Amino acid sequence: HQRANLQNKGKKPDVLYMSATPIPRTYALTIFGDMDVSTIKERPKGRQKITTVVKKNSEIKDVLEMMYKELKQNHQVYVIAPLIEESENSDLTTVCKLKDQMKLAFGEHYKIDIVHGKMASAAKDMIMNQFSENKIQILISTTVIEVGVDVPNATTMVIFDADRFGLSTLHQLRGRVGRGSSKSQCILISDSDAERLKIMEQVDDGFKISEEDFKLRGHGDLFGTKQSGDMSFKIANIRSD
C-alpha cells in the first residue's frame, strides 16, 4: 500500500526494489509484476562463504567447543533463542535460560549479555555498542538482531530451536556473521528433520532461498497483507503455470 502511494505521486516513475532476502510475496511480485530482476552474486571483497551446519540438542557439547574455538581467536558469537522467558505453554529455548547456560560454560573468561525486543531502546543501543566494541563476546538475543547489525568480528551464529524460524529469518540471522575477512559459521540446533534446515545447509543464495520458501509457504496476497499461503485459485498453479 505504501509503495503504491509513492508510485502514484509521479507519472509512471521508475521504481527500484532492493532485497537481500525476498519474502515469498516479493518473489511472486518479481514473477507476476512485470519486473526486471538483477542479482548481485559476488560477495564483497575479502568475505568468505559462511559454513552452515545442523546439530541436534544431544550435540550441544560439540557446539560449545565450536564456539570456544572462535572465542579463543578473539572473535565474537551470537546466540539466538525464539523466546525471551519461559512459558507454561511452551518448552522452547529462552534467552534467559541460555544466559545461565552460557555463563556456566564461558562466564569465567568472556563477557556475556542479552538483548531483546522488550528492552528499552537506550538499553539495547548500549549493549549493541558494547558488542560492536568487543566489550561483550557472547550476545544472546531473539530475532531483534536479524537486520541492521554489522559487527565484522562476529564469526559464529548459533540458533536454538532453528526449526521454529522461517527460511527468510534464518537467512537474515546467518547474514549477521561473515561480514569480515574471517571464516564464519552458522550452527542450527534442532532435533527436527525440517526441510528448511536442509535447505539452509545447502543454499546461501538469497533468491534461491526465497524460491524454496515460496514452494514451502506459498506467496500470500499480491494486493493484500497476507505474506504466505495460497491464493486458492481453482485451476491455475501459480508456481508451475
Model-derived features: where do they sit?
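C-terminal helicase module of SF1/SF2 nucleic-acid helicases/translocases
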Residues: I60-H75, C96-D241
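A short, flexible beta-alpha/helix-coil linker loop
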Residues: K45-R47, L83-S87
